[in-house]
Amino acid sequence: MTDKYKERRFDIYGYEKIDKEVLESIEYEYPEKNTIVEYITDEFSSVCPWTGLPDNAKLTIRYIPHKKLVELKSLKYYLTSYRNVGILQEHAINRILDDLVEFLQPKFMEIIGEFQERGGIATRIIARYEKEEY
């Protein structure tokens, strides 16, 4: 059997293609409350940095806003910017957390990535942030 896949690769982009500048916010009118906001999508996709094969995941973004909410269309564009980025699953979830915490400055945020199976192993990553004082 020949290894005709050995040299096969798909286009893989670097982290510079992650577009956090597309994010927009909406003023949150209830900063004194501890309301939990949750967004769920099963359309997240990035690629393996070594093979270029897709890594598809269900993402849950859960947070307690302080002064800002993320505008959903901008969030969709931000997440879509990962589509051809070569990034490890664990790094993608932490990068999303870092970018959204920097942008929104929430009281609390948790990102859960549930990636489809590879080699019979599914991966679930949970990254959290909690503001010390608010």
From Swiss-Prot:
Keyword Aminoacyl-tRNA synthetase appears in the UniProt entry: no
GO cellular component terms attached to this protein's record: cytoplasm
Keywords, alphabetical: Cytoplasm, NADP, Oxidoreductase, Queuosine biosynthesis
Enzyme Commission number(s) of this protein: 1.7.1.13
Main location: cytoplasm
Pfam families (UniProt xref): QueF
Pathway: tRNA modification; tRNA-queuosine biosynthesis
Positions annotated to bind substrate: 70-72, 89-90
InterPro entries referenced in this protein's UniProt entry, alphabetically: GTP-CH-I_C/QueF, NADPH_dep_7-cyano-7-deazaG_red, QueF, QueF_type1
Disulfide linkage: none
Catalytic activity: 7-aminomethyl-7-carbaguanine + 2 NADP(+) = 7-cyano-7-deazaguanine + 2 NADPH + 3 H(+)
Alphabetical list of Gene3D superfamilies matching this protein: 3.30.1130.10
Keyword Nucleotide-binding set for record: no
UniProt GO MF annotations: preQ1 synthase activity
Stated role: Catalyzes the NADPH-dependent reduction of 7-cyano-7-deazaguanine (preQ0) to 7-aminomethyl-7-deazaguanine (preQ1).
Family per similarity comment: Belongs to the GTP cyclohydrolase I family. QueF type 1 subfamily.
Classification via NCBIfam families: QueF-II
Protein name (Swiss-Prot/TrEMBL): NADPH-dependent 7-cyano-7-deazaguanine reductase
Organism from which the protein derives: Caldanaerobacter subterraneus subsp. tengcongensis (strain DSM 15242 / JCM 11007 / NBRC 100824 / MB4) (Thermoanaerobacter tengcongensis)
Name of the gene encoding the protein in the UniProt record: queF
